[in-house]
Amino acid sequence: MKKTILASSLAVALGVTGYATTADHNQAHASEENIDKAHLADLAQNNPEELNQKPLHAGAYNYNFVLGGNEYTFTSNGQSWSWNYTAAGAQSATSNSVQDVTTQATTNTNETSASEVSAQKQSSNTPVAAVEAPKASSNTQTSAATRTYKVAQTSAASTGGSVKAQFLAAGGTEAMWNSIVMPESSGNPNAVNPAGYRGLGQTKESWGSGSVASQTKGMINYGESRYGSMEAAMTFRASHGWW
């Protein structure tokens, strides 16, 4: 996936120590600095919204390292910042590039393969892709499909900690967050795709908007009523690419 974020402010570092800049290039590499690689990797895997909100610290930096079979890159030129990770040696990555630190709107662009799109058929919650494979076709397609999300101007209530913390406090689980929320909306409670699907679980139903707590309860009710249990809903999402 490739996500482009327009953030509202340029903030300071979040829990990352040992960053420094050089007098000549105003940049630092992970191999040269004592950075917390495990913490950065955990943010990229489990808390991408924190990385999307602000750079690691003020000024330019360039951190690149391999950990746990994935290659991570965090860069900034002092005005915009980006981060990405991918399986070591792979060609596709999950990346975020923040282009304008003063704008109020946020745009996320997720790139997925068309083979994934072919699995996204009749779900009332799946984002509509720009390229749709024929339903009955079993041919492998190599062209890329792009999904675009735009954040609504009215955001969900953010009191009570991060989006993930609110999600877990409202009855959500780590498994739901990783297998449904992150693939559907990247953890953005205000994500809206061009077809009108919205929220953490990407739906057109009423529970797709409002507070994180109300969206979480709506997801649970939907999963249990449609699939019998959230475990069954997660299994279906994992095998079909939509739910």
Curated annotation (Swiss-Prot):
Residues annotated as signal peptide: 1-25
Molecular function (Gene Ontology), one example: hydrolase activity, acting on glycosyl bonds
UniProt feature, compositional bias: Polar residues: 117-127
UniProt-listed Enzyme Commission number(s): 3.2.-.-
Main location: secreted
InterPro entries: Lysozyme-like_dom_sf
Region (Disordered): 99-143
Top-tier EC class: hydrolase
Subcellular location: Secreted
Segments of skewed composition (Low complexity): 99-116
UniProt KW keywords: Glycosidase, Hydrolase, Secreted, Signal
A GO CC annotation given for this chain: extracellular region
Superkingdom, taxonomy of origin: Bacteria
Function per UniProt: Is able to cleave peptidoglycan.
Family: Belongs to the transglycosylase family. IsaA subfamily.
Protein name: Probable transglycosylase IsaA
